[in-house]
Amino acid sequence: LKSACLMLQYLTNGITKKLSDKKLEIKKTFQSPTMAPFCEDGEKYQVVDSIIKKIKNTKEKGEKVGSQTIEKIITINGIRFELLNGSWGLVRASSNKPSLVIVIESYESHDEVELIFNYINKLLDQTGKVGKYDQTLTR
């Protein structure tokens, strides 16, 4: 209860807008499920390193993912790349099972989530070391 009150205080501190109006200002997002394609424990970190190099290469060449360029790359525990419009994709090795972790979020559309997924999946396929996904994209 205390945390809920503190959150309301934070959200309304010095603001004269109604909370319902503030909610309308939040951008809609489209997310993928957290997907986990199979990858052997002994290979998953090398696969992620390979994906990092390929995504950095895409950025350096100015190539597009869908209709967007890659604007930012974070390589802590895998790779998170952010597109010009703020949408992003994440690829990392699972810490507790033989798989990778793939997550995607778009501020534009579910179609863009699919474009980002197709980009990531193509890179993973090129390694020849990634198997079946535990789940796939749904609408």
Predicted segments with their positions:
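Phosphate-binding and adjacent anionic-ligand microenvironments
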Residues: 1-103, 109-139
